[in-house]
Regions:
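Active-site bordering "gate/hinge" segments
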Residues: 1-207, 218, 230-282
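Short beta-strand elements
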Residues: 210-228
Length: 282
C-alpha cells in the first residue's frame, strides 16, 4: 500500500501532468488539422499524393473499457472469449511472391530490390485473432468509437483519438488517487490452484485491448496465450493499407503505434551462463 505522502506526491505530479497534457493535445491537434488539409507530402525528394481516405478500413472496433482498465469482474464483461477465434498466418496471408517495384531514393537506403522474394504466409510473426469472425481495430479510436461515438476515420482519426485520451488519462489518475484507500480490500487476496478450466482477463492498455488467457490445474500452468493490441491490429492495419501510395504506407502503420522490434539480438547461453552463440537479426 502507498503512504499518504506518496499519494499526495502522485496527485501533485498528476495535476502538473494535466497542464502539460492539455498543451500537448492542443499542439498536436493543430498539427493534425494541418496535415489533413494537405494534398501531398514529400518523401525522398518526391511529391507523393496524400489521399483524404488515407488509412480507411471497413473493419469493426473492439474495446473492453473506456480507459486503461477492465470490466472482467462485472456482471456483463466488455470482452467475451466465446466471440474470439484464432487463424494461423499461413491460412490468412498471401503466399510466395516477389518485389516488382523499387525506389533507391526512398529513405533510408532505398527499398528492397526488384525480384526480392517474399512470403507473408511464412514470414508473418503473429497469429490472426478474430472477434465475431473478423479482424478488429483496438486502441484509442476503438475506445472512443465504442464508448463516446467518435467518428473520425483513417490515419488522422487515430492520431486525433490518441491526443484526446491524454487529458482523459490524467483525469482518471486524479480520480483514482482521490478514491484510493490504502486499507481497502485487495481484489486477489489468494493464489488459486486452478481446475484446468479457461481463465481470462481483457484489460485496456494505451495501445488497445490486451487479453491474457490461461489454464491452470493444481498450481501448474497448462496453457497460456496473450492477445496483445498489436496482434489484434496487424490484420486490420493490412486492410487499412489498401489503396494507399506505397511511399506513405509507413504513415498508416505508425497510426497503430505497433509494438514490433526493429531488430532482435538473440543470445544463447549454457548452464554456466556462458554465451555460446549470438546473432543480430534486422
Amino acid at each position: 500500500a502507498c503512504t499518504k505522502q506518496a499519494v499526495t506526491k502522485m496527485y501533485d505530479l498528476a495535476k502538473e501532468g494535466l497542464v502539460l497534457a492539455h498543451e500537448q493535445m492542443d499542439f498536436m491537434l493543430a498539427v493534425i488539422s494541418n496535415m489533413k488539409k494537405r494534398d501531398w507530402v514529400e518523401v525522398g525528394g518526391k511529391q507523393v499524393p496524400l489521399p483524404k481516405t488515407l488509412g480507411y478500413h471497413n473493419q469493426g472496433y473492439m474495446a473492453a473499457h473506456p480507459m486503461y482498465a477492465s470490466t472482467n469482474l462485472d456482471e456483463n464483461p466488455g470482452w467475451d472469449p466465446e466471440r474470439w477465434t484464432d487463424v494461423r498466418p499461413w491460412d490468412w496471408y498471401m503466399g510466395e511472391g516477389e518485389v516488382s517495384l523499387a525506389d533507391p531514393s526512398y529513405p533510408i537506403g532505398g527499398t528492397s530490390p526488384v525480384g526480392t522474394k517474399v512470403n507473408p504466409q511464412m514470414e508473418a510473426c503473429t497469429g490472426v485473432p478474430l472477434y465475431d469472425g473478423a479482424p478488429v481495430e483496438v486502441g484509442p479510436r476503438a475506445r472512443l468509437v465504442t464508448f463516446k461515438k467518435f467518428d473520425e476515420k483513417g490515419t488522422w482519426g487515430q492520431h486525433i483519438a490518441r491526443q484526446l485520451e491524454y487529458t482523459d488519462c490524467l483525469y482518471s489518475i486524479i480520480n483514482a488517487l482521490d478514491e484510493y484507500n490504502p486499507d481497502g480490500k485487495v481484489v486477489a487476496d489468494y493464489i488459486p490452484q486452478g481446475d484446468g478450466s479457461l481463465g481470462w482477463a481483457a484489460n485496456e492498455a494505451p495501445r488497445g485491448t490486451d487479453v491474457h488467457l490461461a489454464k491452470v490445474k493444481d498450481g501448474r500452468v497448462l496453457y497460456y496465450e496473450m492477445l496483445v493490441p498489436t496482434t489484434w491490429n496487424f490484420p486490420t492495419c493490412s486492410r487499412a493499407l489498401t489503396g494507399a501510395p506505397w511511399q506513405v504506407a509507413e504513415m498508416v502503420v505508425r497510426g497503430y503505434d505497433p509494438c514490433v522490434s526493429c531488430a532482435t539480438h538473440m543470445i544463447v547461453i549454457d548452464e554456466d551462463r556462458k554465451v555460446i552463440a549470438q546473432k543480430f537479426i534486422q
